[in-house]
């Protein structure tokens, strides 16, 4: 009986859909609220949301690069370079998806958006890695390691975690 109640509480996770968003309320971003929607949309960067009915329950923002950044400044530069290189490669931008922020409005949404994004990247023809640019917090470490990522590198102000894309 108790197990059924717990399972029913997360039943909504079966109905969610990963969608691309044009903008988000950046003040809700607990990791990088200083990054405006312009930043999140320029140079091939993307915002993805997990939609449950009419509600966005989780958000994850990405840049696409060819190297792993150690800071937001490097992320900015590397995604600009990958964007410019994409002009010569029929629009194929970067081989690494860098998740630089994630948040959830509903319990279980953060883990579910990681799962859905992982599946999307796995299906991609050109993306070979899923790496984070995470803050140096216990919460970020617990979240990513619990979801299967391994610590890749500790930087001056950030940590990179990598999700294994192997079969």
Segment roles from a protein language model:
Residues 103-104, 131-142, 155-160:
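Conserved beta-strand-loop-alpha-helix junction that forms the acyl-donor binding cleft
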Residues 145-155:
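Conserved acetyl-CoA-binding loop of GNAT-fold acetyltransferases
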Residues 104-123:
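Conserved acetyl-CoA-binding loop-helix of GNAT-fold acetyltransferases
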Residues 1-43, 47-49, 56:
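Short amphipathic alpha-helix that is part of the acyltransferase structural core
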